[in-house]
Amino acid sequence: MEIRKRILADMQVAETIDAHEEIRKSVEFLKAYLKKNTFLKSFVLGISGGQDSTLTGKLAQLAISEMRDETGDNEYQFFAVSLPYGTQLDESDRQDALNFMNPDNRLTVNIKASVDASVAALAEAGVELSDFAKGNEKARERMKVQYAIAAMHKGVVVGTDHSAEAVTGFYTKYGDGGTDINPLFRLNKRQGKALLKELGCPEHLYLKKPTADLEDNKPALPDEVALGVTYDQIDDYLEGKEVPADAAAKIENWFIKTEHKRHMAITIFDDFWK
């Protein structure tokens, strides 16, 4: 039980929430960051068409719109970036998500040429990437592009990581995990759905099965299959509810196994890994 106490303390998930209050909490958090760092003028976010980027994008646009209204400074902008590898299977969902969040700016950068070039260069050097490793290349290329856009617009990269994802470390280190600010952390998956429902999001965007969709050989592989545990079980665990012993063990194993992802590069003074 000690490990669960630690996880619950780290993940900060409330047993119940008020969706409207949590929306305002995230928006005010994003605005406060811009107000504190007055040299920053934009948010940049990669949009997949899934629940997490849809919610994060809507919150980011709300924050930017309010900053413009409050300051009269039209330099405040939100950049929603589509980053397909070739053709995305659920492109229609991404377009629905973009229409829902109505971002100031829509950009599309196809990462296929860049990823394939990296894979080919590594192969030429004698390093043949597995399909899984190539999937991580895609995630890191997407983040590289977002930071390039942010650099040109006085921006920061907004992350989609929430507590149900953070507890399992279900993201690529220095890929989708390598962001500047994460307005969803403290929420689990079902709570994110509640916020989207409150915001009037089309329900198919938050009822679809979550997938990282990184592997060529396993297209649209559901997160729950990859993790071996359901989001309902993860959410129950984070809310302090009873879950099957095998599910709890899997969640705790993921937490321990991926702890390095929740830290910057370790130094001689760090002891979490010992």
Curated annotation (Swiss-Prot):
Gene3D superfamilies in the record: HUPs
EC class: ligase
Gene Ontology CC, one term: cytoplasm
Pathway field: Cofactor biosynthesis; NAD(+) biosynthesis; NAD(+) from deamido-NAD(+) (ammonia route): step 1/1
Nucleotide-binding is among the record's keywords: yes
Alphabetical UniProt keywords: ATP-binding, Ligase, Magnesium, Metal-binding, NAD, Nucleotide-binding
Reaction catalysis annotation: deamido-NAD(+) + NH4(+) + ATP = AMP + diphosphate + NAD(+) + H(+)
Alphabetical GO biological process terms: NAD biosynthetic process
Binding site for deamido-NAD(+): 140, 173, 180, 260-261
Pfam families given in the database record: NAD_synthase
InterPro entries linked to this entry: NAD/GMP_synthase, NAD_synthase, NH(3)-dep_NAD(+)_synth, Rossmann-like_a/b/a_fold
Subunit structure: Homodimer.
NCBIfam families tied to this protein: nadE (TIGR00552), PRK00768.1 (NF001979)
Assigned protein family: Belongs to the NAD synthetase family.
Name the record gives this protein: NH(3)-dependent NAD(+) synthetase
Organism: Listeria welshimeri serovar 6b (strain ATCC 35897 / DSM 20650 / CCUG 15529 / CIP 8149 / NCTC 11857 / SLCC 5334 / V8)
Lineage of the organism: Bacteria, Bacillati, Bacillota, Bacilli, Bacillales
